[in-house]
Amino acid sequence: MGLSSILVALMIQPMNIADMQPGSAASVVIIMSFFTILATVIIGVAPVAQIPAYYVPLLTLVTCLGYAPLDYSGKIMMGEVGNHTFAIALGIGFYILGGFVGTLILFIVTTALIAYIRRNNLSRFLINKLHINNPTFGDLFMDVLTGGGLGDLFRKIILGERQQVIDDNLLIALGFRRLFYNPYSPNLERVVEKDVRTKPADLRRLN
């Protein structure tokens, strides 16, 4: 698998974020597994070790369908063991379908799908907790891709105590405010106060 194995391992991050809302991770697994099966059949991907190429995504889909009702009802959640397992299974299915390029493209698509499914909750989180006002879809995407303790650790290592001020409209649209949000910066409050995009209606429109 080579470099593709890194992408497969990185699938764990967005699936972790998806699993923080009941039903979100299950929806992502069902949608992406079904798409992978369909694409594999249409393209006619060759069997791997005499096993049909659609076997991995089909097994992933069937397993998730059996579990999903309890997840949607909020009675249980995948947890780290569950969402990590589904993440790796999806990644392997992506690799079988399209190699490195296919894995990269579907990794991005999966991250975007999670950002879309969780858009309301993520927007509330960015506004209330990180004070990123009027968050763009790029901010949501970057939160799914780099949010959590591991992402913050890398920010601390790379940025130290610096907090980058992002005021370019293109970079804001691409989510660079979330990407460079450094919770370890002593200048964070001053940077937030300078955000010219602050709107009092941000919270009300999400209710």
Residue positions per predicted region:
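Alpha-helical transmembrane segments
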Residues: 2-16, 20-207
